[in-house]
């Protein structure tokens, strides 16, 4: 590996601000805020607005928006039953 061209890669704690879920991972990002992890070591903390613990897709709270297409609009206009019903 060529010296001096790669970013500093180290372990950080990612903290989901919504659910207080924490996980330890490697990153090139750093922070002045630190926290002690379960192994007793202190790591920089990166705060996240959303993670797999709070994202609706991963938690099962996802809502599917039914976008009416041209066929659905035609069926509504002429009184045909929807193909989804």
Swiss-Prot record:
Single GO MF descriptor: structural constituent of ribosome
Keyword flag Magnesium: no
SUPFAM superfamilies with a match to the protein in the record: L28p-like (SSF143800)
Residue ranges that the Swiss-Prot or TrEMBL entry lists as coiled coil: none
One cellular-component annotation, GO: ribosome
PROSITE patterns cross-referenced by the UniProt entry: RIBOSOMAL_L31
Family to which the UniProt record says this protein belongs: Belongs to the bacterial ribosomal protein bL31 family. Type B subfamily.
Subunit comment: Part of the 50S ribosomal subunit.
The name this protein goes by in its record: Large ribosomal subunit protein bL31B
